[in-house]
A protein has these predicted regions:
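Active-site proximal loops enriched in glycine and acidic residues that flank catalytic Cys/His/Asp
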Residues: 76, 153, 335-336, 389-392
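Extended hydrophobic packing segments that form well-structured cores
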Residues: 430-520
Length: 520
């Protein structure tokens, strides 16, 4: 059977035969309980005897760690030309003296305060360094630890830019037209920095999209993209039952290559013991029951399955929180979620993943590392839950997206109405049918199997139907031609988030070698 044969003898539903990867770093029962290798045991110790210490069953529910702030180093480059008789002694630019530079530094500080107040992502601005000579970069406060340089290129030599690039720093190149004294490099950034006195761009890790003129909003979305990327690269994710890929066994390997993901495996035998330990803990069970009761009292919530399935889903949620605390991460995915986990947990993982996402974790079904990296990246950029889903076939500007694990706080705050039902394909357990809001603009990512091309599509939710498919269902309307979308669709699973983050995704992906094909 070929790698991409999905006919019925290959279990043709949204989760076909799993291709669990044994290449990812695994957590054996012993190492899991004692601490993950490579991390200090004292900070990672997780023994099942003191379950309440780890699982938070003293009433304090575990919460995910926050995103790491993007550290931004502002650097002002300028020159102080000296007047000379009967010759051209000064270049373009409104900053010509030390007094001009001091005033510009004060202006930059005001702008950084504006950016900080506007940012919906964690960012730390380091002290401004103003230089006339590349040698002044040596020992500049915070430069070595900075993730990104915000270069205010008022004037001065081009060597500063090259020096920053040689250090491997992402550089946002800011020049002024009318937002302050005009910049010299507003004139010559293209022919000198980008094209190196030629007709074609010569820079490899810096292009036209890295240059901003005047607009702080343009700086802000670039910083948002870089914050999301920094929180994605080398991040850790727990894979229950191993890492896999929808019809593509190399997906975990490719995810590691592109995003340096640290995939930690928890085997199903180990999970079975964790569930057994949690069920034996009366406080853990009581907390799960209390949470189930509170969840069902949320406005717009109706129960259409057995209450016990919801309580078991909450207990599984608490176990997964403890697993992620042990692994010191905020991301988890489940392999064989449409079979193996059901008799073990006596529910489905659908509602569990939904509640985890609502509380700020990144929780995905199917352990499909074709699409999981896109969810991690989009969530880290937007700071909101995302919805892994199955697409259908586009027609007349419309496509249906569906799955059984939809978050209820897709905007990060508002709890949307939901019917708590069974998982569709098993008619078992607890799964939310979230009524995602009509009129909402969504960013949709279509990752390719080869991890070299992702397609982007904006859509508007026009309906939340109730078809005989996965419970969470949305019809989205899009602007591009339906046939063109059908011809350009790669991979299988999509990732969807509220809002338009198409620019941020393209800006981030070019840094990891993935083509962003945005269809509008």
């Amino acid at each position: 059977m070929s790698e991409h044969d999905h006919t019925p003898h290959c279990h043709a539903h949204c989760c076909p035969h799993a291709h669990a990867s044994e290449e990812g770093a695994g957590i054996s029962r012993r190492s899991f309980l004692g601490g993950i290798s490579g991390v200090a045991v004292g900070s990672m110790a997780f023994a099942w005897a003191p379950w309440t210490d780890v699982a938070g069953t003293d009433g304090a529910l575990l919460v995910p760690p926050a995103r790491r702030p993007l550290r931004v180093k502002p650097v002002l480059t300028y020159a102080t030309p000296q007047r000379a008789p009967k010759t051209s002694w000064r270049p373009w630019g409104g900053i010509q003296t030390e007094e001009d530079a001091k005033a510009e530094t004060a202006r930059i500080l005001e702008e950084l305060n504006t950016l900080r107040a506007s940012a919906d992502f964690p960012v730390e601005f380091l002290p401004v360094t103003a230089i006339r000579d590349p040698k002044q970069l040596e020992g500049a406060a915070g430069l070595a630890d900075a993730d990104t340089v915000l270069l205010y290129a008022a004037g001065g030599p081009s060597h500063v830019f090259q020096q920053l690039r040689d250090q491997g720093k992402d550089v946002i190149y800011f020049v002024r037209h009318k937002s302050g004294p005009v910049s010299l490099w507003y004139e010559i950034v293209s022919p000198i920095q980008l094209r190196g006195h030629s007709d074609e761009r010569v820079t490899k890790n810096f292009d036209e999209q890295d240059v901003v003129v005047d607009n702080l909003g343009e700086v802000l979305w670039r910083l948002r993209a870089l914050c999301g990327l920094r929180n994605t690269m080398s991040s850790r994710i727990v894979a229950i039952g191993g890492a896999s890929g929808w019809a593509h066994p190399r997906a975990p390997e490719l995810a590691k290559e592109r995003f340096k993901l640290d995939i930690q495996t928890v085997s199903y035998p180990d999970l079975a013991e964790m569930i057994k330990a949690a069920r034996a803990d009366q406080a853990a069970v009581a907390l799960a029951q209390e949470r189930a009761e509170a969840y069902l009292k949320l406005p717009g919530t109706t129960l259409e399955t057995d209450l016990k399935f919801v309580e078991n889903a909450m207990l599984l949620d608490q176990i997964f929180r403890a697993v992620m605390k042990q692994a010191d991460c905020r991301a988890i995915t489940i392999n064989e979620c449409m079979g193996t986990i059901m008799p073990m947990s006596e529910t489905t993982a659908c509602l569990t993943l939904s509640t985890l996402n609502d509380d700020g974790y990144m929780a995905f079904c199917e352990s499909d590392f074709v699409v999981v990296p896109s969810g991690i990246l989009l969530s880290n950029i937007a700071g909101r839950p995302v919805f892994l889903n199955d697409p259908t076939y586009p027609h007349e500007g419309l496509i249906t997206l569906a799955h059984c694990t939809g978050p209820r706080k897709m905007d990060g705050q508002t709890v949307e109405p939901a019917r708590i039902m069974t998982h569709f394909e098993s008619d078992y357990g607890a799964a939310p049918k979230v009524e995602m809001r009509k009129g909402q603009i969504t960013t949709n990512i279509l990752p390719g199997f080869k991890a070299d091309r992702w397609v982007g599509l904006l859509g508007e939710i026009v309906d939340s139907p109730f078809l005989a498919i996965c419970r969470d269902q949305i019809d989205i309307r899009f602007k591009c031609d339906s046939l063109h979308l059908a011809q350009r669709m790669p991979g299988f699973h999509w990732m969807t988030g509220y809002g338009d983050y198409s620019k941020e995704l393209g800006y981030a992906l070019k840094r990891v070698g993935i083509q962003w094909e945005f269809l509008g």
